[in-house]
Structure formats: structure tokens, C-alpha cells
A protein has these predicted regions:
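Conserved N-terminal phosphate-binding loop of PLP-dependent enzymes in the Aspartate aminotransferase
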Residues: 1-137
Length: 137
């Protein structure tokens, strides 16, 4: 999060963003991309018999290495740092970035559908190349 300082420049920038950038068209594109990404990742996980969860709010998605946790203890038990590091390095080496620590992604209005497909395919490739049982550490 950020803090808005109460000055004329900030309010002018906010007004311009709300008028020209945050439109129904851009939101529709973001949500369409997020839906494609959610479905693509779910297909990757399902095809490999993984019960991993995807959380989505608008154009923001993240996934976890197990069912959706109900509390912090469950979330901690689902953490798989070795797998997470391998996943992030694999993706970085292919020009793709997923937010560290919680595997978060945002879909921008101009994000091409092909980029979403590439990310989903790359996640599938890394999962096919690691021993998921050994990555519990």
C-alpha cells in the first residue's frame, strides 16, 4: 500500500488515472486475463493430480501448494520453500516473474493471452521436472 499525500499534484494524478486508465474496458480486460490465468493454472494442477488452491480477487491471483488454508498454522504447513524457489528460478530463466513469498500474479489490461498461456505452460514444465514428493523441504 501507499499513502496519498494531500497535495494538488497527487489529486490531479489520481483524477487523471481514474478518468483515463481505470475504465470499464481496462477492468474487463484485466478480469478476462485473470479468468484465463485461473483456469489455466487450475488445469495444470488438476492434470498433475495436485490439490493446490488458487485465490483470486479481481485481477489478482495467487496459488498455494495445497488446499486453501483456514488459519496460519495450515498455511505454514503447506509451505514448500524448496519447490517455491525452484519454481521462481525456473520462471525467471524463462523471462517470467511471479511474486515471491505468496506466488502472486496480477493481470494487466494489455497482457497478451499468449503470455498467460506461456506462464501456465512453464508452471506445468517445472512441475513435470521436479520430484513433488521430495520438495516438501
Amino acid at each position: 500500500g501507499t499513502t496519498l499525500a494531500a497535495n494538488p499534484l497527487v489529486f490531479a494524478a489520481l483524477s487523471a488515472a481514474l478518468t483515463h486508465l481505470h475504465t470499464e474496458d481496462t477492468h474487463a480486460a484485466m478480469h478476462g486475463g485473470a479468468l484465463q490465468l485461473e483456469r489455466g493454472l487450475q488445469a495444470v494442477f488438476t492434470a498433475r493430480g495436485l490439490d493446490w488452491h488458487i485465490s483470486r480477487v479481481g485481477a489478482r491471483l495467487e496459488f498455494g501448494f495445497g488446499p486453501a488454508p483456514h488459519n496460519g498454522s495450515e498455511a505454514e504447513r503447506a509451505m514448500r520453500p524448496t519447490l517455491e524457489h525452484a519454481l521462481h528460478l525456473w520462471l525467471l530463466n524463462r523471462g517470467l516473474l511471479v511474486t515471491p513469498f505468496h506466488n502472486m500474479m496480477l493481470t494487466a489490461p494489455m497482457l497478451p493471452s499468449a503470455a498467460i498461456d506461456q506462464l501456465c505452460a512453464s508452471v506445468g514444465e517445472v512441475l513435470d521436472s521436479v520430484d513433488l514428493g521430495a520438495s516438501q523441504a
